[in-house]
Structures are given as structure tokens and as C-alpha cells.
């Protein structure tokens, strides 16, 4: 039976627009290679109908919740439809920055110092519309301030289960923390407050068992946020990254160890920070990286000799 591939895109997460761009690029790349690929927007399509519609494989181009977090992967496994990328557990863990950090720490891998906060546990009576100064009027906040003081300023506040830098804020003064937490809470009940590292942001693409050339990211703004990732033409990317050979080897080993620690499979991208003292810190793993014209995975693949069409065909060949 000829192969019929559903490229799952769009969805309902905050990363919907990025996913639409990624998915349509993937469809074009697969069709260029002669593969019967169809765009399927999961916002308007029941995934459980894929089998009866004759689809034999699924290329997951969804980003964020309900596409990258293990839910979709579980449905596809139930349907016995091979799909691209990591399995249920690895997808769920990678989507959850807090739990992935815990696993990295358990594996002896370096992560940035952080505090994990649950809104209901820390401030059970607070809503997003609360106008009180939380840091001054809530008795639990004293414990929070103590923990944060141990991290030191500046900080980065982010939702634990969100992508594309949605809900992230750099905090340079303690009085900015309240608004930063509320912004993050808009996206998730669990928030990470991390130590801010001055240094270089790097990303490492992994394709099958191969570590592709690393990319160094240079932003003109405060940090590598949504604007810098998908809109700005001022963000600069260097591939290869220009690291010393020994650092490049160290980065590749760290990235693969992190990838394996979560049980990732097929393809993925590992984000790493190199601080000014030469120390690497794992940030997160993306199990369904972006494939837009601003995306980093295709850039690393080009450096390794893959055309875009060859890349998406290789990813599809790794479906399980």
C-alpha cells in the first residue's frame, strides 16, 4: 500500500501560528520528494479518524500542548500509526521544564539554579486579577524571597510547560517579580524562577543518533524571546557556532546525554547556555522543533549537508 502521510499542524496551543508555518513547510518538503503528504489541522480534525482516512504515518509538526506533550503521541500509539519524534513519556517530560530539570540533575547533568513555584501551593487565594502587592502582603512570600535571594538577581521567570518563550520575563529588580509571575501564570500553574546567566545561548540539533553542528544565537534584545525567534531580522545565528573544538565535543556529549536521559527519539533540539566562566547549563529539550524559515533545526541540517526535503524525509524515515 502506498504511503499516505498526515502532517499534523496548527492545533490549539499558544504556538498555533508557528506550527502552521512549520507544518506547511514540511508538507512542501515531503511532496518535493514525491511523498503523498496532507496537512491536517488538529484543531478541526479528529485524530482518531486518521486510520479510517487511510493515513499510514504521522509527521508531528505541532508545537506546545496537546501536540508535543505526549497526549497526541498516546493517541497515535493506540491507533498503531507510526509517528515522528519522541514517544509518550519523553514528550511529556521534555514539555515540562521542571521535571526535565529534575531528571537532568538526577543524571548528574548541569542545570541553572532554580526555584519551582506552584500558584495554588504558594498563594492559594491569589488570582490573576489580584491587585495586592503579593511580595509585601503575603506571609508565604518571605520564604519565596529567601529562596530567590539565594539565586541572586537578575532572574528569568517562565512557565514550566510552555514553548517559544511565551510568558517569559527577565527580572532585574525584586519589585518586578509580581508582574513576572502573573504573566507566567497566564500560561501555566507551575512556574520556574531561574538564575540569569550572562553568556552565550547555544542550540544543538539531534537527528537519529547524530549530533548536528551547534548554533550560536546572538540577540539584540534582552533575551531570545518570541520576537527575536520569529519576527526580528536583527537576531544573528552562527552555524557552526565558533566554539573551540574541545568545547564543541563537550557540548555534543552533554546534549546527547540530556536527550537520552529523557528517552528522546527520532529528532530533537537541545538548548544550552554557556556562561561567561565557560560552564554549560542545560535549558530545555524540544521534541518537535520549529521548521519555519527562522527555525534552527533546518539551519543545522543544512550545515551537515541536508536539503530541507532530505531533512523531512529523514525525520519521516525515523517514525516509529
Curated annotation (Swiss-Prot):
Please give the GO cellular component terms listed in this UniProt entry: cytosol
Q: Report the PROSITE patterns cross-referenced here.
A: ATP_GRASP, DALA_DALA_LIGASE_1, DALA_DALA_LIGASE_2
Q: Which cofactor does it need?
A: Mg(2+); Mn(2+)
Please give one Gene Ontology molecular function term for this protein: D-alanine-D-alanine ligase activity
Give the residues the record marks as binding Mg(2+) 2. Answer: 284, 286
Q: Which reaction is the catalytic activity of this chain?
A: 2 D-alanine + ATP = D-alanyl-D-alanine + ADP + phosphate + H(+)
Subcellular location(s): the record lists: Cytoplasm
The main enzyme category here is ligase
PANTHER family given for it? D-ALANINE--D-ALANINE LIGASE, D-ALANINE--D-ALANINE LIGASE B
Q: What is this protein called?
A: D-alanine--D-alanine ligase
Q: Which organism is it from?
A: Hamiltonella defensa subsp. Acyrthosiphon pisum (strain 5AT)
Q: What gene is this protein a product of? A: ddl
